[in-house]
Amino acid sequence: MQIGIIGAGKVGCSVGKYLQENDALRKAGYHITGYAGRRKESVEEAATFTGTTPFYLLSELVKKNDIVCIATPDSQIKTVWEELCKFSLEGKIVCHFSGSLSSDLFTGREKKGVSACSVHPMYAFSNRFTSYEQLNTVKLTIEGDPKAVAVFREIWNLCGNETGVVSTGKKMQYHAAAAIASNLMIGLYAKSVRLLEDCGFAGEEAENFLRPLVENNIRRMLESSPEEALSGPVERNDAETVQKHLQTLQGSDRTVYLALSEEVLSVAKKKNPQRDYRELERLLREDRRQ
């Protein structure tokens, strides 16, 4: 099956290069043909980088390919789809790579004879020409029509990547989970740095003090489980310390501490099912109501 990519940015270049270089994929009959996009220069750079063809007309890319991948920014995907609908799409598979948008974006696809899906690599692309080198370790989540999902699972599994399937209705929740693990964790770290700065630590000094703690805890969690890695006042049922923390924190710092302590309490209960956390649970619940 021939695969064309619309969009020659970080995602388009990285995915195209990675798939193009995979021998198992080529042997299975999948081939990247080339790129189309708004900027001629970017399209030509992507085609040269991947050893494929620059398509200067969208109609030519559509005509040439069985699978059309939209690798544009989220705000442009709907517009690209509307442009695609001007051409014959019968029997084709269309996908986009947005993490937050679902295949519902491809309105009217049934009438066009299209099978569609969204494919989201759990990875933060940082460079058009080097990010592909890390894609062999990336997991991907696929959502959409059964035929399209099956084809893209085969494509990525042939490359050795693990894939998961999420329902259309859960796509935004899935993306929120990824954002919490990736983006919001950075915000949490930045908040900790700022609190230490308020205690008199300089910015770099605060980070140097926190770094071993963060690295060791994340390593333990990833190598074992959240339950095994968990320690601290909530885990050991130290309601007095938790109460003092809440008394010293203000505003959003206090709100975040309270919300995450409730989540950590759920983990602590799994780790220590014999321990009575009712006093701590009552403290967090009553504090949240204030």
Regions found by a protein language model. Give the residues of each.
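Short, polar loop motifs at secondary-structure junctions
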Residues: R38-S42, G99-S102, P146-K147
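Rossmann-like NAD(P)(H) cofactor-binding subdomain of soluble oxidoreductases
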Residues: F49-T130
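Interdomain hinge/lid region at the active-site interface
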Residues: R219-R275
